[in-house]
Each structure stands twice: as structure tokens, then as C-alpha cells.
């Protein structure tokens, strides 16, 4: 990841990045879902993105470290905590991105800051991510909403690879913009990182009710799984689309 937004690289957003994070032991769990049902759950201004006509929902449990805002002191106690994201795939005026239904995190101040300054649907949750051999045991239960719970054990099972452009793996993982709405206005935030170094993965889900808590039904079929050991990420300011 570049620290210099001035670098002559078309993939780097314009302007100055404002925050950096490291994502560790990331599981991508992807389920195909009915596009007509999902369309009604995203803001009308956004277009639901599909791959060969198929819509997808993804869950990403990971450990967030090295959270730091540029030009500001470190957030107390926010150097490392688990996070769990529920997302789908959208476009706006041809620009692909991500739309989050929820982001659970085990840090009250980070949740408050993300809700206030980035208008994202963060929730405070009791969470734990522990190493277990070459895998991760992951547990999450949202505070005040016992129905939004998650428990899984996952691990990589292949050599690392980078996804081929135009493949489903690439379409699901190489996304560099998020969209959100606030008071009927559309906002977006750009991020930048190196291409994902993925591994195929296996996972056992003993509890998985986060999607259900948002009235999203996941299919009974096994999800498509990817694992990534580490990713350094830069964030640009949230901007209102005008």
C-alpha cells in the first residue's frame, strides 16, 4: 500500500488518505442469493451488482489492527479488535463498490466514531478471535440483539494466489469503494490496498444468524470461501455524491 496519494497510479484515489488499518486472518464467506429479494434491501439510488446475473452476500470476520487516523493521536485501546462485516455488491453510475448491511466490532469508541463520522451501520458486539493451529476460532454476539450472533472455525487450505481479472473471485474481493446513505443523501468512501493474496479455505459455522437479523435468508448450500492472511488498507475521506 502506498503512503503517498500523489503517486502516479490510476488505482490510487485522488487527494490525501486519512486513516490506515491492517486486516488480519480474513475469512470471505460468499453466498449466492436471490437478486429480486436483495434489491429491495439496498437504497434505491444504488444498482445491485451481479455476476452473470447472480447476486451475492458476503460475511467477513477478521482481526483489525494498526488502526490510526492520519494527523491524529492513536485511539485509546483501538490498536486491535475483531470486526465482522455483512455486505453485498452494488454500483453507482458504473462504479462498483460495496454496500454494508452491518459491521460488528468489539470496540465501543470505534463503533461510535464510525457511525458518527462515516454514517456506517456499525454495532457494538462481544467478540473474540483466537488462533487455533493454522486456523481461527471466531465468536461474535451483538450487544442488545441476541439474534445477531456468529461462531465459526476457519483455516486456509491452499497455497496463496491472486484472483484472475473477470473471475468470480476477483469480482467478490477486489472492491475499492463503499457506499452508504445518510438523510437521503448518497456518500462514498474510497480505499486502497494491494491486490488480495487469497487462499482457498474451509470453515465450520456453528452459529450464523447475523444475516437473518437483517431479514436476509442465506441458502442452505455451502458458501464459497476465501482466506487472506493480512492486508494493509488506506482510507480516503467520506464524500457526498453531488
Which residues fall in each region the model found?
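A glycine-rich, hydrophobic loop/mini-helix early in the fold
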Residues: 51-57, 64-104
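Hydrophobic, proline/glycine-rich low-complexity stretches
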Residues: 1-70, 212, 216-217, 224-242
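Short, surface-exposed, charge-dense and proline/glycine-enriched linear segments
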Residues: 2-7, 75-87, 129-135
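Internal, well-folded beta-alpha domain core
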Residues: 26, 85-242
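Short, surface-exposed linear patches
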Residues: 49-53, 71, 81, 110-112, ...
Amino acid at each position: 500500500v502506498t503512503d503517498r496519494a500523489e503517486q502516479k497510479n490510476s488505482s490510487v484515489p485522488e487527494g490525501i488518505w486519512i486513516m490506515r488499518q491492517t486486516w488480519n486472518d480474513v475469512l470471505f464467506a460468499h453466498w449466492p442469493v436471490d437478486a429480486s429479494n436483495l434489491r429491495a434491501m439496498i437504497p434505491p439510488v444504488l444498482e445491485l451488482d451481479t455476476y452473470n446475473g447472480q447476486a451475492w452476500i458476503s460475511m467477513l470476520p477478521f482481526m483489525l489492527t494498526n488502526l490510526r487516523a492520519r494527523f491524529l493521536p492513536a485511539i485509546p485501546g483501538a490498536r486491535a479488535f475483531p470486526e465482522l462485516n455483512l455486505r453485498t455488491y452494488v454500483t453507482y453510475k458504473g462504479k462498483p463498490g460495496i454496500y454494508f448491511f452491518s459491521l460488528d466490532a468489539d470496540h465501543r469508541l470505534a463503533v461510535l466514531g464510525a457511525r458518527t463520522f462515516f454514517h456506517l451501520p456499525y454495532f457494538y458486539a462481544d467478540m473474540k478471535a483466537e488462533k487455533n493451529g493454522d486456523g481461527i476460532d471466531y465468536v461474535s454476539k451483538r450487544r442488545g440483539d441476541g439474534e445477531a450472533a456468529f461462531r465459526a472455525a476457519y483455516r486456509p487450505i491452499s497455497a496463496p494466489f491472486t484472483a484472475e481479472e473477470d473471475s468470480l473471485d476477483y469480482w467478490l474481493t477486489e472492491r475499492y469503494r463503499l457506499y452508504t446513505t445518510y438523510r437521503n443523501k448518497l456518500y462514498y468512501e474510497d480505499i486502497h490496498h494491494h491486490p488480495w493474496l487469497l487462499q482457498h479455505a474451509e470453515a465450520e459455522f456453528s452459529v450464523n444468524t447475523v444475516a437473518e437479523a437483517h431479514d436476509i435468508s442465506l441458502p442452505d448450500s455451502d458458501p464459497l470461501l476465501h482466506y487472506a492472511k493480512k492486508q494493509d488498507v488506506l482510507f480516503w475521506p467520506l464524500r457526498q455524491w453531488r
